[in-house]
């Protein structure tokens, strides 16, 4: 494992190591990719945990097991050494992500956008998104200049999202501010 050469701003979290698997140094991983197996397409990971130095690791193999992945990392052959990686986020440089069609966005691109209703009122900024099964949900938290100090949950649907202006850092929504 090496110190990572990638810039911290360039890295996007795509998963998290949450425990060990077996006695040979394999780790269980929650994947944030869709489908979850896409995480295995990235062979070099930067592992990050608050208060620790980033580590660069190489993926040797991985397999789907229920709702998580079991992965083998190069040079990690011991259960106790693998246990030390629990809690690390798995990051990759954003330039490795596939290009999307027009009108499609990665979640990290939406986070931080100002959310403005049809009346021009600032509802807040997108803090993060949740996957609910039926549709994704944006968690909109108040920010400087917000209409009020309420947190809102807005569906990421065509009916709600009217327009996204990445250059302006804004999303226009069809949403009643009283909700």
Curated annotation (Swiss-Prot):
The yes or no answer to whether the keyword Cytoplasm is present is: yes
- Which Gene Ontology cellular component terms are annotated? cytoplasm; ribosome
Q: Which GO terms describe its biological process?
A: ribosomal small subunit biogenesis; rRNA processing
Q: Which UniProt keywords apply?
A: Chaperone, Cytoplasm, Ribosome biogenesis, rRNA processing
**Mind telling me which Pfam families this protein's record contains?**
PRC_RimM, RimM
- Any keyword Chaperone? yes
Can you tell me where the transmembrane regions are?
A: none
Q: Where is the PRC barrel domain?
A: 102-179
InterPro entries given in the database record: PRC_barrel-like_sf, PRC_RimM, RimM, RimM_N, RimM_N_sf, Transl_B-barrel_sf
- Name a GO molecular-function annotation: ribosome binding
Enumerate the subcellular locations listed in this protein's record, separating them with semicolons.
Cytoplasm
Q: Which SUPFAM superfamilies match?
A: PRC-barrel domain, Translation proteins
Subunit structure of this entry?
A: Binds ribosomal protein uS19.
Q: What does this protein do?
A: An accessory protein needed during the final step in the assembly of 30S ribosomal subunit, possibly for assembly of the head region. Essential for efficient processing of 16S rRNA. May be needed both before and after RbfA during the maturation of 16S rRNA. It has affinity for free ribosomal 30S subunits but not for 70S ribosomes.
- NCBIfam families per the UniProt record, alphabetical: 16S_RimM
Its family remark reads: Belongs to the RimM family.
Q: What is the UniProt domain comment for this protein?
A: The PRC barrel domain binds ribosomal protein uS19.
Record's protein name = Ribosome maturation factor RimM
Q: Which organism is it from?
A: Pseudomonas syringae pv. syringae (strain B728a)
